[in-house]
Amino acid sequence: MRKKLFSLALIGIFGLVVTNFGTKVDAATRSYGNGVYCNNSKCWVNWGEAKENIAGIVISGWASGLAGMGH
């Protein structure tokens, strides 16, 4: 659980560092699949997509913790 919390904190810090409120995506933009996008001049976060990914991480961690309680 600590590892997942550390990962979430790291994602949050990274998101705060590279946040740019524009969400325009062009052909030269690279998506990292977690809501973070970068092109040659800047990086930014699509917070709607990032929140979905963070929620998925939290839910899967919670569910795997419940599954491990039976052992």
Swiss-Prot record:
Coarse class of the primary localization is: secreted
Q: Which cysteines are joined by disulfide bonds?
A: 38-43
Location in the cell reads: Secreted
Signal peptide (UniProt feature, chain positions): 1-27
One short Pfam family name for this protein? Bacteriocin_II
Domain of life from the UniProt record: Bacteria
InterPro entries found in the cross-reference section = Bacteriocin_IIa, Bacteriocin_IIa_CS, Bacteriocin_IIa_dom_sf
In terms of pH, the activity is described as:
Stable between pH 3.0 and pH 7.0.
| Membrane spanning residue stretches | none
Activity over temperature: Thermostable, retains activity after heating at 100 and 121 degrees Celsius.
Protein keywords: Antibiotic, Antimicrobial, Bacteriocin, Disulfide bond, Secreted, Signal
* CC terms in the record's Gene Ontology section: extracellular region
Key word Membrane present: no
Tell me which Gene Ontology terms the entry assigns under biological process: defense response to Gram-positive bacterium; killing of cells of another organism
Q: Family per UniProt? A: Belongs to the bacteriocin class IIA/YGNGV family.
Briefly state the protein's biological role. Bacteriocin that inhibits the growth of wide range of Gram-positive bacterial species. Does not inhibit the growth of several strains of Gram-negative bacteria.
Designated name of the protein: Bacteriocin enterocin-P
